[in-house]
From Swiss-Prot:
Residues 21-199 form the Guanylate kinase-like domain. PANTHER family: GUANYLATE KINASE (PTHR23117:SF13), GUANYLATE KINASE-RELATED (PTHR23117). This is Guanylate kinase. It catalyses: GMP + ATP = GDP + ADP. Its EC number is 2.7.4.8. Gene3D superfamilies: Guanylate Kinase phosphate binding domain, P-loop containing nucleotide triphosphate hydrolases. CDD domains: GMPK (cd00071). It comes from Burkholderia mallei (strain ATCC 23344). Essential for recycling GMP and indirectly, cGMP. SUPFAM superfamilies: P-loop containing nucleoside triphosphate hydrolases (SSF52540). The gene is gmk. ATP binds at residues 28-35. It holds the Pfam family Guanylate_kin.
């Protein structure tokens, strides 16, 4: 196989929006254990990169720029938005939040998987632009368990917990939009299921083609509808 054919296979893969890396979107109501599971997954799988959002809000105590968020000004955020640099963005309580499209595409093109901790509205925006993005919804084993977890965190007043539980009901209604659902009854089992989802996604035809385009073309295998 010539170098030009190899380059052509890889170029066609990228042109078709199929990257060597995968994009995972993890959605869950507050208290379902999303962040704990995501952090554990990231520590076990060095090939996954966590997307860090841009925000115009001020850093909270202990937060570091580039680790928790990319903290920026309203002017800079609006300029980036005008340049279509964000995959999805929203205004929350007077502050802007956005997910960098440029960074995500760069990571996926070099073969890294990218994970987004995101709400269901953001996931809908992402899915419209990345049809191969994989949605994973984390569910609690019951509403009673969710309430108990929120209380044990000790972070919120009772009225805030009540609001979170009400919000959880509307959020959970969007679980059907995800490709996978993980019920977080026990941490170990839920983490194992997340790892299985990642492994299965990496074996999808489009993922394998993007990672091994040279081999697929040599064997006469092409992307569906490819010319």
């Amino acid at each position: 196989m010539t170098d030009s054919n190899r380059d052509g296979a890889a170029a066609h893969s990228l042109h078709a929006g199929v990257y060597p890396g995968n994009l995972f979107m993890v959605v869950a109501p507050s208290g379902a254990g999303k962040s704990t599971l995501v952090n554990a997954l990231l520590s076990k799988d060095p090939e996954i990169r966590l997307s860090i959002s841009y925000t115009t809000r001020k850093p909270r105590p202990g937060e570091q720029d580039g680790q928790h968020y990319h903290f920026t000004t309203v002017e800079d955020f609006r300029e980036r938005h005008a340049r279509h640099e964000f995959l999805e963005s929203a205004e929350v309580h007077g502050n802007y939040y956005g997910t960098s499209r440029v960074w995500i595409e760069e990571q996926m093109k070099i073969g890294h998987d990218v994970l987004l901790e995101i709400d269901w509205q953001g996931a809908q925006q992402v899915k419209k632009q990345f049809r191969n993005a994989v949605g994973i919804f984390i569910l609690p084993p019951s509403l009673a368990a969710l309430e108990e977890r929120l209380k044990k965190r000790g972070q919120d007043e009772p009225n805030v917990i009540t609001r979170r539980l009400l919000a959880a009901g509307s959020e959970i209604a969007h679980a059907a939009e995800a490709q996978y659902v993980v019920i977080n009854e026990t941490f170990e089992h839920a983490l194992a299921e997340l790892e299985c989802i990642v492994a299965a996604t990496r074996l999808r035809f489009t993922s394998q083609y993007a990672r091994h385009a040279e081999l697929f073309v040599e064997l006469g295998i092409h992307l569906p509808h490819a010319e």
